Amino acid sequence: MPRMLPWLGLVAALCLGGPVRAAESVALPELPYIPLGVVGHDNNAAYPDAQMERRLQLLDRYNLRSYRSGEFLLLDQPRLDRLVALARQYRITLRPVITQQLTQAQAYALAKRYAKDIKIWEIGNEQDHSRVGAGIRISRLVDIYRGIRRASDELDAGLKTTINVMSCNSYDTGPKARCPGDRLGSMWFLDQAKAAGFDFDYISFHYYPHYQDRGHWMDLYLGQMRAMAEKYRTQIFYNEVNCAEIYKGTTDGGRPGDRSCYDSLEYILSELNGRYRDIVREINVYELLDEPTHPVAHERHFGLMYDLDRPKPVMELVRRYAGTP
């Protein structure tokens, strides 16, 4: 099937005033794309400290303006200091994610130290993974939130917080189902967190589409995202996305027209920049570099590049949506 021109879907939406159909691509040169960035894992051997500046230089060169990382650096102050300084130098916005392991005191100290550079803190990563123990996990997130809130109030820094959830299959009714019969997906997790005292400002969302998700499944999952944004009157940081075909063995990111990995990523970027651009504030592709030593086999191949010198063809797609040649 021929690839769609990247501006057709948005033209239809603007001219007709209705929703863009799932089969249409998007992007008009005279209109901005949703800001695009990447995820990085600075604890992994694929991300050595010696190449930290090269990574930030590459992001700047490709107009990838945000970098979701830091979860493994948050307690390594010298390394985080360096990352923050480099991000400032190359005009990259850091989007650190705090795991549930930090204490309130640690979160307070972090937020206070970096208040001038890090204005939005994401608290928790995919903590909606199970209903079992959710209350305990949420209580830890609330403690972290309170530490950040106290630092912000003391400094009058205006710091914001983000809560994270994943897409959820409402047709799954098995013993480990997270949202059985509930098309709103992980809304239950947001509701519980809000009730427990986590007064989050933004929501971050994770969904990795298969090419065959176009239509019903993609509408289901992105519909969950929209419902969350509307209920809580906020914006979405879509900060983990790539093709789901990688879970099934794709290692090279695919090629244009493959009706598989490459086309999956192009399709979701098209949809987000079309029907969902009103609620999605930022997108981060998972991830910048392959991690060949990762203990989980499929986690080795999510990179847009094999390494800093060898981009995959899919990087050209990402550069296009980032607005670079």
Briefly describe each language-model feature range:
Residues 109-138, 162-170, 201-211, 238, ...:
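Active-site groove signature of glycoside hydrolases
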Residues 31-36, 63-65, 90-94, 116-119, ...:
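Short, well-ordered coil/turn segments that N-cap beta-strands
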Residues 22-41:
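Mature N-terminal, pre-catalytic/accessory segment of carbohydrate-active enzymes
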Residues 43, 248-260, 264-267, 272-325:
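Aromatic-rich peripheral "rim/lid" segments of glycoside hydrolase catalytic domains that contact
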Residues 97, 138-260, 297, 301-308:
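Noncatalytic carbohydrate-binding groove/subsite architecture in carbohydrate-active enzymes
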Residues 6-15:
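Bacterial N-terminal signal peptides
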Residues 44-59, 103-113, 179-194, 262-272:
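Short, acidic/polar
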Residues 50-75, 95:
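Catalytic domains of carbohydrate-active enzymes, especially glycoside hydrolases
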